[in-house]
Amino acid sequence: MDGKIQTSLRPTNTPWNKGRITGQKRPLKPKDVWAIRIRLQLKHQVCDLALFNLAIDSKLRGCDLVRLQVEDVCAGGRVRDRATIIQKKTGRPVQFEITEQTRASIQAWLPKVTARDGKYLFPSRFRAQLHLSTRQYARIVHAWVESAGLDGSAYGTHSMRRTKAAQIYKKTGNLRAVQLLLGHTKLESTVRYLGIEVDDALSISEQVEL
């Protein structure tokens, strides 16, 4: 030892989240959902409209949404009212509804999918035999929210998953129903996912006067 302080020659790593807004992504408000939907309709973006509507209805994680196959949501050339898939993360089944306007948008998109002889509902935009990647999906979501004048850094693919779930909870207060729709195994996961603990506590407190 020569008495000198030895300094590390390793380069300093920049934290991945430096300069980024992190944390839970916000759900879209109903007015934002309609703003995006109308823009997609006006621009005749058939694929994006089907993807957006199904993302809202299904409440699926991005990894499950992009892996959907035509046969998951269609039977005999018609779009189902309800569908069930096995979640990639948990290996458990989850069921979701497909509303009338979502069925119509998927039905409009189907001819282009079947024309490619593809099995995936949303094929990759670069390789037709593969499904849309989660990274591609994230970029699409970013474009959607910015087209509606929203801050792209505050929203993400989980915003699509949380949007309808948040509205269902807001209107019904039924956490168990939301848990089932999101495919969570524990109710605590749903509570954390919706970020409702503080809001609920304050709402209860506001109703008590002393």
What is each stretch, according to the model?
Residues 1-210:
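Conserved catalytic core of the tyrosine transesterase superfamily
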